[in-house]
C-alpha cells in the first residue's frame, strides 16, 4: 500500500512539473490543425468556384479555347489544393510525432531498471536547465546543452527562439515583428482577453487605464463593438506606442491618420487611453507635463517586452517561473529550518544546502519546512538521535549523540567540539524527550 501511494504521489508530481512539456507541442499541433483546416477549406472553395464556372460555360455552346482555359484554371486550383494539403498534413504530422516522442520519454520515468531511471533523471535535469537558460536569455548555452544531451525534441527551444526575435525587434523599437506574432495568434489572444474579462466581471474588479506597465496592460478593457472583437491588449499597446513614436518624430498628421485607422472602434478603458494619448497632439515632444512625459519615456519599450513575455507564457500556459526555479525552491523549503539562520552560524551544517552561502539568501523568503514530528540530529556525526543513539547532554548544556561521544572519547574524557571544554564521559547525562 505504501509503495502504491508513493508511486501515485510521484505520478502526480510528474504531471504537475511536466505539464509544459506536453502542453506546448499540443498547442502547436492544435494551431497547425486549425490552420490546415482553414487552408484546405479556402482552396476547396476556390476549386468549387472554378468548377461551377466550367459547368456554367459547358451548359451553353462554348468555344474550345474558353473551355481549355477554364480546364487549365481547374487544374491549377487542384494543384494548389494538393500542395497546401500536403504541406499542412506534413506540419501536423511533425507536431503529432513530437507529442508522441515526449509522451514516450515521460513514460520512461517508471522504468524498473535503475540505470534507465538514472538516465531519465539526468535528462530531466538537463531539460529543466535548458528551459531556465532560455528564460534567462542564454540562448546559445541552452541550445548547446540541448544538443549535447540529445534532448532537442524534448524542450521548447523553437518557442523561445521565436520570442527572442520578437523581443530583439522591440529592443530596436520596431513593432512589425511583434504585430506579426499577434496576427498569427490573434484568435487565442482574444480568447485570453475574453477569459480575463469574465474573471474581472466575477470578481468585480474594474479595469484601469494602462500606464504602460505589464500588470496594468493586462487590465485593459475587454468590450466588443457590434460583434467585432477589439484588438488584443498587446496589439493595442503596440498601436499606442506607434502613435507615441509618431508624436516623438513630430509627425502629427501621420499620428492622426494612425489613430483614425486603429483606434476608431476603441471602447471602455481602451477608449480612455486613446483619449489620453490624443492629448499629446497639443504638447511638444520634450514636454515635462505629466502624464505625457511618462508616455514619451523610452522605458515603455521595456514594458512592452515584459507584456509580450507575459502574454507569450499565458498563450502556451506556462508559469512566470521556470520548472527548475520552482523545483529548487520547493526542495529548499522542504529542508529549511530556523537553525539555518542563526546569527552566530554555530548551528549551520556543512551538509545542508540551505546553510550554504550560495543558497542561504535564495531560501530566505521561503517558508520553513513543515515537520509534524521533530528529529534530533547529532552535531558531530549528522546522525539522528533515537533509542539506538540516545541524546547525551554535557555539563555545559550541549547535546550530542551517544555514538558520537564514544567515537571522540579518549582516556574516558570528551572534548566539546563547540566550546573545547573537557569533561569526563560519565558526566554526560541522558536526555529524555517528552
UniProtKB/Swiss-Prot annotation:
Gene Ontology MF terms in the entry: actin binding; ubiquitin protein ligase activity; zinc ion binding
Domain CTLH: 159-254
Enzyme Commission (EC) number: 2.3.2.27
GO CC list: cytoplasm; cytoskeleton; GID complex; nuclear matrix; nucleoplasm; nucleus; plasma membrane
Region: Extracellular and involved in cell to cell contact, residue numbers: 1-124
Keyword rRNA-binding: no
Location in or out of the cell: Cytoplasm; Nucleus, Nucleoplasm; Nucleus matrix; Cell membrane
InterPro entries tied to this protein: CRA_dom, CTLH/CRA, CTLH_C, Fyv10_fam, LisH, ZF_RING_GID
Zinc fingers (RING-Gid-type), renumbered ranges: 352-419
Sites marked Essential for ubiquitin ligase activity: 352
Keyword Translocase assigned: no
Post-translational events: Autoubiquitinated as component of the CTLH E3 ubiquitin-protein ligase complex (in vitro).
Written domain comment of the UniProt record: The expected RING-type zinc finger domain is highly divergent and most of the expected Cys residues are not conserved. Still, the protein is required for CTLH complex E3 ubiquitin-protein transferase activity. In addition, the conserved Cys-352 in this highly divergent region is required for ubiquitination by the yeast GID complex, suggesting a direct role in catalyzing ubiquitination.
Stated role: Core component of the CTLH E3 ubiquitin-protein ligase complex that selectively accepts ubiquitin from UBE2H and mediates ubiquitination and subsequent proteasomal degradation of the transcription factor HBP1. MAEA and RMND5A are both required for catalytic activity of the CTLH E3 ubiquitin-protein ligase complex. MAEA is required for normal cell proliferation. The CTLH E3 ubiquitin-protein ligase complex is not required for the degradation of enzymes involved in gluconeogenesis, such as FBP1.
Protein name: E3 ubiquitin-protein transferase MAEA
Organism per entry: Bos taurus
Lineage: Eukaryota, Metazoa, Chordata, Craniata, Vertebrata
Amino acid at each position: 500500500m505504501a509503495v502504491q501511494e508513493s508511486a501515485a504521489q510521484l505520478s502526480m508530481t510528474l504531471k504537475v512539473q511536466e505539464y509544459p512539456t506536453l502542453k506546448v507541442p499540443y498547442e502547436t499541433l492544435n494551431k497547425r490543425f486549425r490552420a490546415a483546416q482553414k487552408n484546405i477549406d479556402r482552396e476547396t472553395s476556390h476549386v468549387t468556384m472554378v468548377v461551377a464556372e466550367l459547368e456554367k460555360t459547358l451548359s451553353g455552346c462554348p468555344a474550345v479555347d474558353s473551355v481549355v482555359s477554364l480546364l487549365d484554371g481547374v487544374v491549377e486550383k487542384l494543384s494548389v489544393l494538393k500542395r497546401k494539403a500536403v504541406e499542412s498534413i506534413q506540419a501536423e504530422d511533425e507536431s503529432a510525432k513530437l507529442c508522441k516522442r515526449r509522451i514516450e520519454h515521460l513514460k520512461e520515468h517508471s522504468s524498473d531498471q535503475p540505470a534507465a531511471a538514472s538516465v531519465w533523471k539526468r535528462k530531466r535535469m538537463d531539460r529543466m536547465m535548458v528551459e531556465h537558460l532560455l528564460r534567462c536569455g542564454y540562448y546559445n548555452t541552452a541550445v548547446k546543452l540541448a544538443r549535447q544531451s540529445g534532448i532537442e525534441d524534448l524542450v521548447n527551444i523553437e518557442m523561445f527562439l521565436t520570442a527572442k526575435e520578437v523581443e530583439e525587434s522591440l529592443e530596436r523599437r520596431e513593432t512589425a515583428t511583434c504585430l506579426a506574432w499577434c496576427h498569427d495568434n490573434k484568435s487565442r489572444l482574444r480568447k485570453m482577453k475574453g477569459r480575463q474579462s469574465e474573471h474581472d466581471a466575477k470578481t468585480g474588479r474594474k479595469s484601469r487605464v494602462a500606464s504602460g506597465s505589464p500588470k496594468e496592460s493586462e487590465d485593459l478593457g475587454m468590450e466588443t463593438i457590434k460583434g467585432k472583437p477589439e484588438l488584443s491588449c498587446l496589439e493595442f499597446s503596440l498601436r499606442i506606442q506607434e502613435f507615441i513614436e509618431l508624436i516623438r518624430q513630430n509627425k502629427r498628421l501621420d499620428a492622426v491618420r494612425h489613430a483614425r485607422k486603429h483606434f476608431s472602434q476603441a471602447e471602455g478603458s481602451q477608449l480612455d487611453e486613446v483619449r489620453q494619448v490624443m492629448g499629446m497632439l497639443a504638447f511638444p515632444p520634450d514636454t515635462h507635463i505629466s502624464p505625457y512625459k511618462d508616455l514619451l519615456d523610452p522605458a515603455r519599450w521595456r514594458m512592452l517586452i515584459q507584456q509580450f513575455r507575459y502574454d507569450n507564457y499565458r498563450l502556451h500556459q506556462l508559469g512566470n517561473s521556470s520548472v527548475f526555479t520552482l523545483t529548487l525552491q520547493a526542495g529548499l523549503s522542504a529542508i529549511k529550518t530556523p537553525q539555518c539562520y542563526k546569527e552566530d552560524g554555530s548551528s549551520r551544517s556543512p551538509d545542508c544546502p540551505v546553510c550554504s552561502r550560495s543558497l542561504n539568501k535564495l531560501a530566505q523568503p521561503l517558508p520553513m519546512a513543515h515537520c509534524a514530528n521533530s528529529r534530533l540530529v547529532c552535531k558531530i556525526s549528522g546522525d539522528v538521535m533515537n533509542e539506538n543513539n540516545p541524546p547525551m547532554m554535557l555539563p555545559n548544556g550541549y547535546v550530542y549523540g551517544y555514538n558520537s561521544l564514544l567515537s571522540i572519547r579518549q582516556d574516558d574524557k570528551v572534548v566539546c567540539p563547540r566550546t573545547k571544554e573537557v569533561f569526563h564521559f560519565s558526566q554526560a547525562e541522558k536526555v529524555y524527550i517528552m
